[in-house]
Amino acid sequence: MITPRHQPQRGAKATMQHVLIIHEVEDYPAWKAVFDQAAAIRKHAGEIRYQLLRYDDAANHIVHFSEWTSLAAARQFFESPELVEIRRKAGVKMPQFIFLHEIERGDL
């Protein structure tokens, strides 16, 4: 079972926590349908926002970049048996997870 997201401590400076997932899917439209159906559980687990990208020469190679309330919440979610089953049903092949702390952001 996926537990509710972790909240930053009151008064603590919020730093952005991100997860970068790179994976191949069997069929993008089928994967996207499962991804969209999981929106509520992703939000409940602590995902704040996301961005989906694909390789310019391979429509089934997906990059999922997301912001989380905490990396602990993200790890708990992505390692949960429930999500392993969702990935299997969605046709995900060998996902690579990169957990990231934001250190700087700027506009040019």
Describe the residue ranges of each PLM region.
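Short S/T/G/P-rich N-terminal loop/turn motif that feeds into the first structured element of a domain
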Residues: 2-85, 89-108
